[in-house]
């Protein structure tokens, strides 16, 4: 390799098979034809070990996030978690909860050697959850409660768009009150959401007025959104300058392109889970994963934030934020373009956002919690 890489996490959509049929599924798991075609090309157990687990350490990977579809529908799901542990990786499992029994939770927890994080999706804790998911949130809440009782670490993914603007404050507050860390994922046009992007995707104005104020409030999900108005020198201080090429790490902040990467069920590699099926850097069956990273123009671009265009390229927060690369692609057709949903319009890098002080203050709280509570775990308030 020409560079040393320090990626942290692989988001692996190990299958498109699912036991639900969410109408806006990002991985098209509600489309029987797409699932059938994908099933024939799914990486086998041996291929996953050879092409992913055996090579990912070379680019710094520490965590395997197993997703789908519904990952646990794979007959080898438990074996894959055991293999990941054998190779020294921690494991997270994204699940809808429908097939995740207490016995399975215990088995996966044991297979991960106690490192397991269970991630569920809750877009709203009210009835609006059913707009974008196949049912209400009771099932996900039950899984979270069971994990809490068993001492298994928990996480929540909140898909953000027009569908939950009104309920977002209550949803995030519920997660905070229950000590559950979360990340926001923007509604995009990948998969079955393609024809509904205009209907559900948030606008710049909605991000500024409704979404961003709520995301700024809570340290539980503090690193996982854009725009991220952190004082660059503050991150440099806490991270001691740790970067994956130019992408800030320890902790990772802003856009996660460049600190994690995604692999689809068929072996295609992308810099972001939202960009799978849209941005293909190569296939692990055809080329070793480290070589894909090293030779792919896509990865070499996203790892070098000096190449960002438009206002993202003249912004004080160019490196600590990076703008959402998915929004750049879906709105402007270029993953290195400016993020058009960002409401900050700097004239040059000297201009500060009015939210920098608030962002920096809660960032310090976030760093304190992570260093004292551990990965993906925030202690519940007394």
Language-model-derived ranges and their functions:
Residues 24, 63, 117, 181-183, ...:
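Residues at the N-termini of beta-strands
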Residues 17, 21, 25-28, 258, ...:
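Cys/His-rich metal-chelating microdomains
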Residues 1-116:
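Conserved alpha-helical substructure of the radical SAM core
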Residues 11, 15-18, 247-250, 265, ...:
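Residue-level signal for mature regions of secreted extracellular proteins and peptides
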Residues 34-38, 90, 111-256, 260-269, ...:
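Radical SAM enzyme [4Fe-4S]-AdoMet core and its adjacent flexible, acidic
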Residues 1-4, 274-382:
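Flexible mid-to-C-terminal extensions adjoining Fe-S/redox cofactors in radical SAM and related proteins
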Residues 6, 21, 60, 112-114, ...:
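Short loop/turn motifs at secondary-structure junctions
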């Amino acid at each position: 390799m020409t560079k040393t890489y320090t990626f942290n996490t692989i988001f692996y959509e190990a299958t498109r098979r699912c036991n639900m049929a969410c109408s806006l599924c990002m991985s098209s798991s509600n489309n029987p034809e797409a699932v059938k075609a994908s099933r024939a090309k799914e990486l086998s157990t041996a291929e996953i070990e050879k092409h992913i687990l055996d090579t990912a350490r070379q680019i710094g990977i520490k965590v395997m996030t197993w997703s789908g579809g519904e990952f646990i529908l794979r007959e080898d799901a438990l074996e894959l978690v055991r293999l990941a542990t054998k190779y020294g990786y921690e494991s997270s499992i994204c699940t809808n909860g429908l097939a995740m029994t207490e016995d399975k939770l215990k088995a996966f927890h044991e297979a991960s050697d106690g490192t397991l994080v269970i991630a569920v999706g809750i877009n709203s804790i009210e009835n609006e959850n059913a707009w974008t998911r196949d049912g209400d949130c009771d099932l996900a809440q039950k899984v979270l409660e069971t994990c809490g009782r068993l001492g298994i670490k928990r996480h929540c993914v909140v898909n953000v768009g027009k569908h939950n603007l009104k309920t977002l404050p209550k949803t995030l507050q519920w997660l905070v009150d229950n000590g559950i860390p979360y990340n926001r994922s923007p509604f995009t046009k990948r998969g079955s959401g393609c024809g509904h992007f205009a209907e559900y995707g948030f606008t710049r104005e909605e991000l500024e007025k409704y979404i961003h104020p709520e995301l700024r409030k809570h340290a539980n999900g503090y690193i996982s959104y854009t725009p991220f108005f952190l004082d660059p020198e503050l991150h440099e201080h806490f991270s001691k300058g740790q970067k994956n090429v130019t992408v800030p790490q320890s902790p990772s902040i802003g856009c996660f392109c460049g600190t994690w990467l995604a692999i689809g069920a068929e072996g295609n590699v992308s810099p972001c889970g939202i960009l799978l099926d849209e941005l293909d850097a190569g296939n692990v069956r055809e080329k070793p994963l480290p070589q894909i990273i090293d030779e792919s123009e896509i990865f070499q671009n996203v790892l070098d934030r000096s190449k960002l265009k438009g206002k993202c390229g003249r912004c004080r927060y160019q490196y600590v934020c990076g703008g959402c690369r998915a929004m750049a692609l879906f709105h402007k057709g270029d993953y290195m373009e400016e993020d058009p949903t960002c409401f900050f319009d700097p004239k040059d890098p000297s201009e500060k956002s009015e939210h920098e002080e608030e962002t920096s203050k809660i960032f310090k709280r976030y760093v304190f919690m992570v260093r004292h509570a551990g990965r993906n775990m925030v202690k519940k308030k007394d």
